[in-house]
Structure formats: C-alpha cells, structure tokens
Amino acid sequence: AVLYPPRKVKVTAHPGIFENKLAEHQLVSGQSLFYIGMPYSYEFLTKGLYADFDLQTEFCEIGPGIYYSGQVPRETDFEHPDPHLKVEDNTQIQVDQVWDDISLLIDTEKGPVVLLGCAHAGMVNVLNHFCKNTGYKKFHAVIGGTHLGFQGPGEQLEKSLQALQDYQVDLVAVSHCTGQEIGAICYNRFPERFS
C-alpha cells in the first residue's frame, strides 16, 4: 500500500529481505519446506513501483526521532533462532538467523517506544541493542511480535518478562507471533500495563 500508486518512495530495509526464505512444516505426508520470503522481486519493486531502497545493516536514524535497529547482535545465551525457519544460499539450506528482522524505536513525548517486527533476535537482545545505541535505560512502550509463542513457557519467556520489568516498560502490547498463551501470561504478569 505504501508503494501504490507507483511513485518514488524511500524504503529502508535490510539487504537480506530478498533472500530465499523457507519454513519447515510437518505434513501428514512428511516434512516439507515452503517459501515464505518476499513475494516481489527487487526489480519489480524498484522498476515497477519506483521503490528507492536504502539497504542498511547498521543502527541508524531514518527520520527525526525514528531509529532503525539494523542487524541486532545475538548476545544472550537463552534466545535462539527458530529451527523451523530456513534460508537457502545457492545450494545450501541452513537455519535462518533472520538478520533482516528489523525493529524501530520512536521518540515520543511519553518516552521511547519500541516497535518489534517479530523479534527473531530475541526481545531482550533487541531492547539491549536499543539501550546501547541510544543510551535509553527505560522504554515507554514495547509493541509488536515477540516470537515467544514458538518457544513456549521457560527461561526465554521469564528473562524476557524480567527485561520488561528492568527497562520499566509502561505499556506492553504484544501481538501475532507472541501467541495467545504467552500473551495471556504477559497480561497476568503486567495487568495494569498490558494492552
């Protein structure tokens, strides 16, 4: 919708968005890989819809008070890639680290707001990354997908919830890949802050 009608629009994204992304699913007939990557080619987006890509891997400010995470370092020992997500590079298929999953930080009057994509790097890694790059020690809100729904209850969930506490997050608004069970756990932990 942003690129239609066709006109020149700057799009900041990770160069990995055009990789051959696959998801492994267990079917009755056995395990199979399905394409889940970008539905449109770089050529179509740039020549057909006039997207002006600014492919970035590093943290940067993309507008006044709007920060692009870039590639988030995987530093915690409890946040791991989803083994069912794969990437094909030439003829090799391997677990996708999902380096192209991007989060944003937006400065607001109430404080910094973190918008998570799916937090494939792990929510704690994302929050720590923004803390290191901006100096913020407190976030007003964390909104978006946490990918915790695929991990289930356990160490990663507990440490992620503790990070929300440690960073004094005022508003917790998790979505899609967090899952209903983990969303309910978040609500029970932070009923006054959950949305």
Q: For each predicted feature, which ranges?
A:
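Cap/insert and terminal regions of metallo-dependent hydrolase folds
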Residues: 9-12, 94-103, 107-194
